[in-house]
Amino acid sequence: MKKSVCFVFALILLAGSVCPLFSGAIDVEHYVMWIPGTANGYIGVYCKKGEVAKSPSEIPEYTNEKYFYNFIGWYDWRAQTGGTTEDLRSFVKEYYADPSWPRGEPFPEFDPQPVIEDTPYFAYFDKVPKKFVLTEGSTKATIRDVTVLLNLLTGMDQPLREGADGDVNGDGWVSIKDVTGILLYLTYGVE
């Protein structure tokens, strides 16, 4: 009896480990990055392990019409630059902080390639993304969102705890104004 129970349990574990291989799922961790100066400040996702997501349909959270005009692909800033923190800051300033972007110029050729673990890929478009319809939910970012931004822009681990600067009432949320202020300071050195 014990052997049969163990056998069934082993089959369940095996099925659980094998099924994801055939599900077509992509291991992607999402976040929204707010950059001042653009129509809505939207930038990309954070990809981890697996293939690059090639269309918004593979990212359910971002398929809403208000987020996209026409999705083109992912831009691997590490492959196109030296991959340093300063390169990322320059990338952000050049491609996303300019209110007139895009300037009728195509982004660099996108060459799909396997995702290197923990490599950020940024979404880009052939038109400026639509402006968000601001609602209670879309005017706030989580503490985790801000932490990811700080880590990307500084290369250091700077977690924001509940009650920290930016989280005025200690509820774990940060306003868009706070996020924009943080990014302005990090990218331009101004408050």
Predicted regions and their residues:
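Cellulosome-associated attachment modules in secreted, modular CAZymes
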Residues: 17-26, 126-191
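Positively charged n-region of N-terminal signal peptides that target proteins for export
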Residues: 1-7
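Generic structural signal for beta-strand residues in well-ordered domains
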Residues: 6, 64-67, 113-116, 142, ...
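Secondary-structure capping and domain/repeat boundary segments
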Residues: 23-130
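Bacterial N-terminal signal peptides
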Residues: 8-20
